[in-house]
């Protein structure tokens, strides 16, 4: 089992548990976190995976200081040179085993994308969800466009994406974004019980069912990923993106100019 710096991976029988482990940064994602998520999903031999975050957050999205400031121009260049579904998204969307998100706190930005890439979402009463990309002058990733719409319908998805609004666990349940809401103390026991129930079934049949759901419901994520990365490459270069990031870091209201 690999040693990781920003995630923790453990196995309980046939269930693998991935915990994002940057609590001081509210489990914000760095380039290292993305690489480790990609590796652990690709190399795990578990029959069911659980993804969660170390309290107090599930995942607060990209680490703005690393990914959206000084590194922003490099990210844009990389996306422009090779528009494709990002490796972490590809690993999560294409794994042949079920993935359950145990959402223990805020799941915003790519943290919400991560939750949406799971097959099932169980959340604590402390959970919050938000597709905040529009607030940074960006578009969301593939799960926000496809999976969110599958779960809550086009109209509710459009409202969440266009506004960047944050919703609580109760609202998420009403919208059918999550399968259930439990107390914070019950989150991991409930999620692990479900994961072990799934992992106890014949693995080949479970994998075939997952493949069938993907075939029946999902778009071509590779094609959608190319569209997303091409769009992000352009949006990373806009004044509105720079203003969205600066306003967030300065804790002030943004002023967008449409360019």
Can you say where each PLM-predicted feature lies in the sequence?
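Glycine- (often His-adjacent) and acidic-residue-rich active-site loop
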Residues: 53-91, 107, 137, 220
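Conserved CoA-thioester-binding segment of acyl-CoA-metabolizing enzymes
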Residues: 1-54
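Crotonase-fold acyl-CoA enzyme core
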Residues: 7, 90-204, 237-238, 243-246, ...
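Helix-loop "lid/cap" segments that line or gate small-molecule binding pockets
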Residues: 160-161, 198, 212-216, 230-236
């Amino acid at each position: 089992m690999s040693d990781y710096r920003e995630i923790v991976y453990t196995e309980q029988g046939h269930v693998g548990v991935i915990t994002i482990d940057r609590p001081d940064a509210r489990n914000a994602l760095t380039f290292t976190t993305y690489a480790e998520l990609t590796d652990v999903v690709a190399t795990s031999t578990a029959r069911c995976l659980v993804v969660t975050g170390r309290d107090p957050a599930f995942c607060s999205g990209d680490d703005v200081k690393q990914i959206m400031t000084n590194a922003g121009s490099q990210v844009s260049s990389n996306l422009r040179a090779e528009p494709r579904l990002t490796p972490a998204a590809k690993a999560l969307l294409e794994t042949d085993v079920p993935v359950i998100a145990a959402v223990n706190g805020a799941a915003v930005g790519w943290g919400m994308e991560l939750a949406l890439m799971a097959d099932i979402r169980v959340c604590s009463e402390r959970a919050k969800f938000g597709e905040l990309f529009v607030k940074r002058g960006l578009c969301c990733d593939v799960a926000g466009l496809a999976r969110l719409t599958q779960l809550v319908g086009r109209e509710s998805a459009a409202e969440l994406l266009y506004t960047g609004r944050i919703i609580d666990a109760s609202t998420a349940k009403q919208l059918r974004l999550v399968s259930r809401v439990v107390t914070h103390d019950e989150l991991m026991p409930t999620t692990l019980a479900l994961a072990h129930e799934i992992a106890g079934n014949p693995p080949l049949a479970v994998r075939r069912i997952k493949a069938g759901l993907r075939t029946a419901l999902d778009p071509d994520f590779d094609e959608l990923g190319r569209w997303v990365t091409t769009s992000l490459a352009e949006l990373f270069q806009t004044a509105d993106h720079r203003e969205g990031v600066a306003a967030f870091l300065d804790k002030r209201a943004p002023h967008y100019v449409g360019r």
